[in-house]
Structure formats: structure tokens, C-alpha cells
A protein has these predicted regions:
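Glycine- and small/polar-enriched repetitive beta-structure motifs of secreted/surface proteins
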Residues: 1-406
């Protein structure tokens, strides 16, 4: 039951076959074909110069190919499958525990698959497909060009995603940088960054970043820089950064192109909106709640809703509703409701209700209700006035406490 054909070929396994110079078939039912080929495992096949199949029912095809693991498969020059069920396909590809010497390699590398030049899958249930990928995290996989994965349960689909130590994560795209041994991250896009403290980060876009836990960045160049913050839109920024000096800016939300929410629980919605302090709300294109970053976040609570509402304002406890309402105003406790209401005010606790009401005021505690009411009130005796009606109380410099009607 032995067949040996070739110079110095030997066939010692039951029903084994050796064909070629210095071939050796020592495993039962094994086949060795090629110069120096060796089939030692039962039912194994070695095909190619210096090919070696040591594991039971293993297959080695190619020059200097080696299969050590039981039921393992190696195909390609220098390929090596060294653990049970491992598959290595491609030039110098490696699947399984590289230190294994026999077909019983243990847990590491079992059911590993490596396909591609220099690909390595060296942990249990791993997949490495592509040139130079190295996967050593249990249950992880890399598909594409050189990426190294050491974290467990992590997959990378794309090229040049560096070394990923994060566990239970997914990276889909190219040139992404996942720093540190984080977990639960999801990245879709190119050239994105997840910092070392950012567990459970979500990025969808290009050139975006998350630098704190549970952050979300969606959109080109979006950035989530504080815990639980959400940035949605081109160049959107949510979190403590870009000059903010107080607070942690947790749970901030910025939605819209160039929007910025830099305070704790701040909300900025709309193109170019800015909510720079804690619990501030800015809604509407270019709406703002104050640019002064030298005052403690805890002292500033502003709300601006409307196109350019509160833009250029400086103060605290102000509320502006309407297009251009409260624009370029300075002071505390002011309220303006209506188109351009309360615009260019310097003073405190003023109230303007109606289109163009309460504009250009340099005084405090005035109330203007109606179209154009309470415009151009000055501090020279012009405080604490009430103007009700269209055009009422314009250009007032009268005594304190007047009630002015048209």
C-alpha cells in the first residue's frame, strides 16, 4: 500500500504516495508531490517544492509552504497555517499561532483565515485579507491593505488604518486613526481620529474627530470634543475647545455647517450658530449667544432663536427671538421678540416686542411694545420708560417712569 517514485523518495504511511526527488509521505493516506515535499499528517497533502503538511487532513500547496494545524490549508510561496482549521493564502501569509510546532496549536489561531501577501491571522476566529494585515485580537478581522488589529471583536475594512487596539469596534474607510485601547467605536469614512479616552465614539464623515466618551461626529471636519457631545454638519464643533475656558461642555449639541456648541448642555442649531456657554441655546442661521469666553460659563445663560439673532451680543440671561433680534447688544437680562427687535442695545433688563422695537437703546429697564416703539432711547434720563404702540417712545430722553403712547 505504499507508492514512492523519485530519487530518495519514501512512502511509509499506510496507502501513502510520494512523487519526486527526496519526497516523503509518512502520514497514512497522505500525498507528497514535489522536490523535498513532505506529508506527515494523516490524510494530508503537500504539493510543491519543500512543501510541508504536518497536520491531520492538512493541505500545503506551493513552494516552501507549511501547514501545521489540523485541517489547515496553506497556498502560496512561504504561506503558513499553523493552527486547527487555519487558512493561509498568498505570499508569506500566516494564519494561526506562529509559534506552534505541531497540529495541536491550542486556542490561539483556531479557525483563522489569512489571504494576501504578508497577511497574518494569529488569534482564534480571526480574518486577515490583504497585503500586510496583522490580526492578533480574538474574533477580529482586517480586509484591505496594511492594518494591525490587537483588540478583540474589532473589524477594519479599508486601507492604512494603522494599529487598532480598540475592542468591539468597527472601522470602515481609509487612513483612520483609532488611538488607545478604547471600545465600542464605529468609524465610517476617511482620515478620521478617535482619541484615547473616546469609548463608544461614532464618526460618519471625513477628517472628523471624537475625543471624549460617547461622542458623535457626523460630517466633514466635524468634531465632538467633550463627553456625550454631538456635532452634525460640515465643520460643526460640539464640546470644550477652540478657546473655551470654562466647563467641560458635556452633552453639547451642534447641528449645521460651521455650528459651534462649547458649553455644558449647550445647543446650536443652524449654519454658523454659536452657543458658547453652559445651557445656552442658539437656533437659526448665524444665531449666537455671546462670544465672551472670559466669563465663567456658569454665569451666562442666553437664548437666541432666529436668523442672526443675538449675533455679536455680549451679556447674560438674555432672550432673543426673531431675525436679527438682539444683534450687537450688550447687557444682562434683556428680552427682544420680533424682527430686528432689541438690536444694538447697551443696557440691562430692557424688553422689546414688535418689529424694529427697542433698537439703539442706551439705557436700562425700558419696555417697548409695537412697531418701531422705543427706538433711540438714551441714558440721559431715558431709563424705566414704557412705550406702547407704533412709533411710540422714539428718541426719548425724558424723565424716568414715563408711559408713552402714540
Amino acid at each position: 500500500g505504499y507508492i514512492a517514485i523519485g530519487v530518495q523518495s519514501t512512502s511509509s504511511g499506510h496507502l501513502s504516495t510520494a512523487f519526486g526527488t527526496k519526497t516523503k509521505a509518512s502520514g497514512a493516506y497522505s500525498t507528497a508531490l514535489g522536490v523535498g515535499a513532505s506529508s506527515e499528517g494523516e490524510g494530508s497533502i503537500a504539493l510543491g517544492g519543500a512543501a510541508s503538511s504536518k497536520g491531520k487532513t492538512s493541505i500545503a500547496i506551493g513552494t516552501k509552504v507549511k501547514t501545521v494545524g489540523e485541517s489547515a490549508t496553506s497556498i502560496g510561496y512561504g504561506a503558513e497555517a499553523s493552527s486547527k482549521g487555519a487558512v493561509a493564502i498568498g505570499l508569506d501569509s500566516k494564519a494561526g499561532d506562529g509559534n506552534a510546532a505541531t497540529g495541536t496549536a491550542g486556542a490561539n489561531g483556531i479557525n483563522a483565515v489569512a489571504i494576501g501577501t504578508g497577511a497574518k491571522a494569529i488569534a482564534k476566529n480571526t480574518i486577515s485579507i490583504g497585503t500586510g494585515n496583522v490580526v492578533s485580537g480574538v474574533g477580529s478581522g482586517a480586509i484591505g491593505d496594511p492594518t494591525t488589529i490587537t483588540g478583540a471583536g474589532t473589524y477594519s475594512l479599508g486601507n492604512d488604518n494603522g494599529t487598532i487596539a480598540a475592542s468591539n469596534s468597527g472601522v470602515f474607510g481609509n487612513n483612520n486613526n483609532i488611538k488607545g485601547a478604547t471600545s465600542g467605536n464605529r468609524v465610517i469614512g476617511n482620515n478620521n481620529t478617535v482619541e484615547v479616552t473616546a469609548n463608544n465614539a461614532l464618526i460618519f464623515g471625513n477628517n472628523a474627530g471624537v475625543s471624549a466618551a460617547n461622542g458623535i461626529a457626523i460630517g466633514e471636519k466635524s468634531a465632538s470634543t467633550s463627553e456625550g457631545s454631538i456635532a452634525f454638519g460640515l465643520n460643526s464643533k460640539a464640546g470644550n475647545g477652540s478657546g473655551a475656558t470654562f466647563g467641560l461642555a458635556k452633552d453639547a449639541i451642534a447641528i449645521g455647517t460651521n455650528s459651534s456648541a462649547r458649553g455644558d448642555k449647550a445647543v446650536a442649531i443652524g449654519k454658523g450658530t454659536q452657543a458658547n456657554h453652559d445651557s445656552n441655546i442658539a437656533i437659526g442661521n448665524s444665531a449666537e449667544t455671546g462670544r465672551d469666553l472670559t466669563v465663567s460659563n456658569y454665569d451666562i445663560k442666553n437664548i437666541s432663536i432666529g436668523y442672526e439673532a443675538g449675533k455679536g451680543m455680549n451679556g447674560q440671561f438674555n432672550s432673543y427671538l426673531g431675525t436679527n433680534a438682539g444683534q450687537d447688544s450688550k447687557g444682562d437680562g434683556n428680552s427682544a421678540f420680533g424682527l430686528r427687535a432689541g438690536k444694538t442695545v447697551t443696557g440691562n433688563t430692557n424688553t422689546a416686542i414688535g418689529m424694529d422695537s427697542g433698537q439703539n437703546v442706551e439705557a436700562s429697564s425700558n419696555t417697548a411694545i409695537g412697531l418701531n416703539a422705543g427706538q433711540n432711547v438714551t441714558a440721559n434720563g431715558g431709563g424705566s420708560n414704557v412705550a406702547i404702540g407704533t412709533n411710540a417712545g422714539r428718541n426719548v430722553t425724558s424723565s424716568i417712569g414715563d408711559i408713552i403712547q402714540p
